């Protein structure tokens, strides 16, 4: 029993050793001993183990064909004539051979260069140092020439960039200056528009004041006719288109109304006992241009021998005028004169005295509007005519 168990154990060990040896040697020789020593693996895709003898025969075939660059797997297989070799085996081995040869060639070249340099250093004595320096200095310009060209190109590029930056900065400054100029122009335009708006507002205020005065006077004297501001504006536009220079002021509108409504005014003047002065318009315009002072119209309301003959036409004093008119509604006179001339003020007072004497004689029932009372003294003094070109609201 013991002998049998020992024998079985030996068999198991021997079988295990055989299995290990078979695993350790995966490449097996061909079936026949005359296969030229090819060792193939037992895989599904068998691989060839290149032995030194097989590799030498491969190198001989490659050299016969003219080198690794000219040799091909088919020609190598024909030259070698070993059965069992395939194109797959030869192709992979040829690629490896070419790579190794190129690497060896590069390494040999480097080794050769190093060896030559060491030999040159060993052979150069002290007497030949000048020649060696000349030889070393000679090829330096060729080596440094690409570097110098690159530096010059870089310097040129930097110079051009600097010029472009200068041009851009100059353009930026010009753009900023142009923007400031446009801003100043816009500010000036806004200021002028604001002034024009203020002027229009003043004209509107003057129109409102005039309409209030007309309404109050027309309420007291319904027989007397006054022009509305709209009619005055229409007459002003007609006057600008026909005869007079372009003046959109309220005074020019009032003066233009006399020429356009002459016939209707004649009837009204005859009915109210109004006396008008018929003069030359050109002479009137010349006198207006020659006069440097500012003319103003003053409405005067007189009561007997008392009262101020010249009152301003502000809206705040309208009530005072109405109170005077209520006391003496039959004594209405309009005096036109220049401020600063005492003689003209005295003449206006004389006119008021004349009107009072006429009213005492029996003319109190009618309203007399005297527009020009100094016709007889035209040669000695300046004529006083109903001219509203110098009229303004203060």
Swiss-Prot record:
Consequence of gene disruption: No visible phenotype when grown under long days conditions, but early flowering when grown under short days conditions.
Motif (LHEQLE): 161-166
Induction (record text): Up-regulated by nitrogen deficiency.
Result, substituting residue 70 to A: Partly directed to one or more nuclear spots. Partly located to extra-nuclear aggregates. Complete loss of nuclear localization
Tissue: Expressed in phloem and/or cambium.
Presence of keyword Transmembrane: no
DNA-binding region, residue range(s): 73-98
Source organism, top-level taxon: Eukaryota
Key words of the record: Coiled coil, DNA-binding, Nucleus, Transcription, Transcription regulation
GO CC annotations, alphabetized: nucleus
A Pfam family reported for this protein in Swiss-Prot or TrEMBL: Myb_DNA-binding
Ranges in coiled-coil conformation: none
Protein family membership: Belongs to the MYB-CC family.
Subunit structure: Isoform 1: Homodimer. Isoform 3: Does not form homodimer.
Function: Transcriptional activator that may activate the transcription of specific genes involved in nitrogen uptake or assimilation. Acts redundantly with MYR1 as a repressor of flowering and organ elongation under decreased light intensity. Represses gibberellic acid (GA)-dependent responses and affects levels of bioactive GA.
Stated name of the protein: Myb-related protein 2
